[in-house]
């Protein structure tokens, strides 16, 4: 019996839609359960090309839940090059905490930028 992996997906605002949707499609096609967490103070985010979408939750809700997932996937976007300007925002502090938590639990942490 093969157990399905469960993945937490982080999406910045704005996110690279092509990258995000490729991840989500691959997970869907392979029967891998996932939840998308917005790296923002709200669930509603956008893609680099202006498409609006609603994530399952925000990154704040992912804190303390690394044991619920096998992997953390970071989906990059135009928000990352200007990260330094917003590094002190609560959602970016939550992002760093979540990455640290997943790494500390020896979870797979992957992404693209």
Task: Write out the residue ranges for each language-model feature.
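Short glycine-centered segments of the SAM/dcSAM-binding site in methyltransferase folds
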Residues: 108
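Extended, subdomain-level signal for the structured scaffold at the beginning of enzyme domains
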Residues: 1-105
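Catalytic nucleophile serine of serine hydrolases
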Residues: 111-113
């Amino acid at each position: 019996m093969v157990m399905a992996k469960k993945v937490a997906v982080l999406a910045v605002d704005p996110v690279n839609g092509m990258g995000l949707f490729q991840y989500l499609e691959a997970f869907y096609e392979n029967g891998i359960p996932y939840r998308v967490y917005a790296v923002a103070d709200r669930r509603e985010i956008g893609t680099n090309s202006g498409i609006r979408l609603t994530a399952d939750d925000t990154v704040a809700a992912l804190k303390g839940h690394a044991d619920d997932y096998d992997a953390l996937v970071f989906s990059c976007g135009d928000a990352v090059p200007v990260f330094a300007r917003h590094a002190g925002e609560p959602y970016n502090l939550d992002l760093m905490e979540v990455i640290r938590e997943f790494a500390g639990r020896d979870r797979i942490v992957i992404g693209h930028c």
